[in-house]
Amino acid sequence: YDFSVKEVIEMGWLEGKEFITEKFDNALHKVGMECEISHLFDKSFNQLSGGEKRKVHFARTLIQMYNRDFETKSRYIMLDEPTANLDISHELQLINILKKKTLEGFGVFIILHDLNLAYHFSDKVAFIKEGKICAFGTPDDVFKEKILTEIYGLDVSFDNSTKKISYY
């Protein structure tokens, strides 16, 4: 299917196509600016890079937070690997948008496999192995060599001075 970027984001508007109004346009403008994709709205989604597609999907997620009265509809954002296919600058941009959302009162739940990213940008971390939570707490509480080695079955080192995790 060949949809424009705007149409892909529009699919996230939970009120349905009959409610595409000026309120939607305001929400679209807001998420377009936040995700820095406004210039892509008329472009075919199929022509985007993997990182651009990821940003469009993120914008579609954000627009779901507003109803036709542009009042906040949801207080939680749940994302699975939102930084996949993003270069470092766009990864940080997305993380900073999410941090801003937490300051606005939103709860943000993210599944990440990048341990360093999880350590540096999370307030709380849960490690799940075989469907069970085996460690939960602040990054400083759970990013311990013993815990990480048990979870991953690898030799894991954590450098307290640089706050970097290495595994081999």
Summary of predicted features, one role per range:
Residues F136-G137:
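ABC ATPase "signature
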Residues S44-L48, E52:
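Conserved ABC ATPase signature
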Residues T149-Y168:
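ABC ATPase nucleotide-binding domains
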